[in-house]
From Swiss-Prot:
It comes from the Eukaryota. The gene is atpA. F-type ATPases have 2 components, CF(1) - the catalytic core - and CF(0) - the membrane proton channel. CF(1) has five subunits: alpha(3), beta(3), gamma(1), delta(1), epsilon(1). CF(0) has four main subunits: a, b, b' and c. It is an enzyme of class 7 (translocase). This is ATP synthase subunit alpha, chloroplastic. Transmembrane segments: none annotated. SUPFAM superfamilies: C-terminal domain of alpha and beta subunits of F1 ATP synthase, N-terminal domain of alpha and beta subunits of F1 ATP synthase, P-loop containing nucleoside triphosphate hydrolases. Its main location: plastid. Its EC number is 7.1.2.2. The lineage of its organism: Eukaryota, Viridiplantae, Streptophyta, Embryophyta, Tracheophyta. It is found in: Plastid, Chloroplast thylakoid membrane.
Length: 508
């Protein structure tokens, strides 16, 4: 029989060593219980230390956001249908506020409000992440807007100019071409080093597919990210989509780049937020919207900025879209967004139906940045245009009652009709600055007066082609100097004269 020699001191030292090496890891998890769930809302008991806006994880993997922190329960909105969440199920607080991955790899992709790809082209690699709700740049971080953001639409670039870092509202009834103005602006950024983000909120999947298709055909997807939450998405995701778009645009803005973001449209986001708020039993205010619906939009649109030179002079230009009912601009959401933005482009159903497209009502559209956002060449030719159109609108109303008009009035009416014709443009056909300058110069200096009104559009299209092929130096001068010099003017005058003769011969 072998005797085992037990040495207590050796065993003691082993035990002591193990005790010293033992690291006590206590994982504290904040857990609650589902009291009630339905309509995209869950009431949870027991989440004591949850933050406002914190992400919560349910047993089935659904994620929610804690919005209502009440004395006895927490109201959370779900980012999914929540059909498999059961009463009494457990909920875990993640300790995180909603954030999304960001990187250059997002360019050319279609993603949802959680920045997950929905275009079937595989995962997007990203090493960085940004909070969906980031604070807007402060006063010291900004500088005033001074560079133009060309939309390619004559009516806007000449009379309601938009600058980089501005927020310009596009407002009008449904089916007046609001999305067309926004998408044309994206198409016009080709080769301008501007990253675009198009956020579609609560739209038909077919409309979004059509927009994406246009971008792909015209090569605009290379510099564009589409964030889409369709009409059948949960209200929570429709509410988050614009903030996700803003976070993606901010990533590029803080990297010294210029960005353009379009929110299409904020009325639907406000409706989704109203639905969430009413289901959370928050008290309704005007038009049943909650009291903080102004803050919903102001904290989003204040993130658009022109950054100071210390921060690299990046910019984020926002074009929010708001839909009106029967042209009523004094409803709650339209007045809110008008008061937040730096101007608005008003699209009118009457003009649209009369065949004036883009249907921009120049009389009540404004840009509060003004000519600071125009190149000198455009200022030189466009000054007269707005005045002449305003006088024409006044005269036209007056001329309906008067039967015998003097010669000067008739001439002014004829000029006005031709100028209105000059502002018409086909969809997805944005014009470069030099083409716009040539077009406006032709109109305000009376070179169109000898043509019939129905010939004007055709004449201008062909004149622009003639300039490109026969007088390329005109475009070069405008592009390089950004000034409508005397040389440019004389080249343009000769070109107009030569082409008018050709055109009139063809017409005969």
């Amino acid at each position: 029989m072998v005797s085992i020699n037990i040495r207590p001191d050796e065993i003691g030292s082993i035990i002591r060593k193990q005790i010293e090496e033992y690291i006590q890891e206590v994982k504290v998890v904040n857990i609650g219980t589902v009291l009630q769930v339905g309509d995209g809302i869950a009431r949870i008991y027991g989440l004591d230390e949850v933050m406002a806006g914190e992400l919560l994880e349910f047993e089935d993997g659904t994620v929610g956001i804690a919005l209502n922190l009440e004395s006895d329960n927490v109201g959370a909105v779900l980012m999914g249908d929540g059909l498999t969440i059961q009463e009494g199920g457990s909920v875990k607080a993640t300790g995180k506020i909603a954030q999304i991955p960001v990187s250059n790899a997002y360019l050319g992709r279609v993603v949802n409000a959680l920045a997950q790809p929905i275009d079937g082209k595989g995962q997007i690699s990203a090493s960085e992440s940004r909070l969906i709700e980031s604070p807007a740049p402060g006063i010291i971080s900004r500088r005033s807007v001074y560079e133009p953001m060309q939309t390619g639409l004559i009516a806007i670039d000449s009379m309601i100019p938009i600058g980089r870092g501005q927020r310009e509202l596009i407002i009008g009834d449904r089916q007046t071409g609001k999305t067309a103005v926004a998408t044309d602006t994206i198409l016009n950024q080709k080769g301008q080093n501007v990253t675009c983000v198009y956020v579609a909120i609560g739209q038909k999947a077919s409309s979004v597919a059509q927009v994406v298709n246009t971008f792909q055909e015209r090569g605009a997807m290379e510099y564009t990210i589409v964030v889409a939450e369709m009409a059948d998405s949960p209200a929570t995701l429709q509410y988050l989509a614009p903030y996700t778009g803003a976070a993606l645009a901010e990533y590029f803005m803080y990297r010294k780049q210029h960005t353009l973001i379009i929110y299409d449209d904020l009325s639907k986001q406000a409706q989704a937020y109203r639905q969430m708020s009413l289901l959370l039993r928050r008290p309704p205010g005007r038009e049943a919207y909650p009291g903080d619906v102004f803050y919903l939009h102001s904290r989003l649109l204040e993130r658009a900025a022109k950054l100071s030179s210390q921060l690299g002079e990046g910019s984020m230009t926002a074009l929010p879209i708001v839909e009106t009912q029967a042209g009523d601009v004094s409803a709650y959401i339209p007045t809110n967004v008008i008061s937040i933005t730096d101007g608005q482009i008003f699209l009118s159903a009457d003009l649209f139906n009369a065949g004036i497209r883009p249907a921009i009502n120049v009389g009540i559209s404004v840009s509060r940045v003004g000519s600071a956002a125009q190149i000198k060449a455009m200022k030189q030719v466009a000054g007269k245009l707005k005045l002449e159109l305003a006088q024409f609108a006044e005269l036209e109303a007056f001329a309906q009652f008067a039967s015998d008009l003097d010669r000067a009035t008739q001439n002014q009416l004829a000029r006005g009709q031709r100028l209105r014709e000059l502002l018409k443009q086909s969809q997805s056909a944005p014009l470069s600055v030099e083409e716009q300058v040539a077009t406006i110069y032709t109109g305000v200096n009376g070179y169109l007066d000898i043509l019939k009104v129905e010939q004007v559009k055709r004449f201008l299209v062909q004149l622009r082609e003639y300039l490109v092929t026969n007088k390329p130096q005109f475009g070069e001068i405008i592009r390089s100097t950004k000034i409508f010099t005397e040389d440019a003017e004389s080249i343009l005058r000769v070109a107009i004269r030569e082409y008018t003769e050709l055109f009139l011969l063809q017409e005969k």
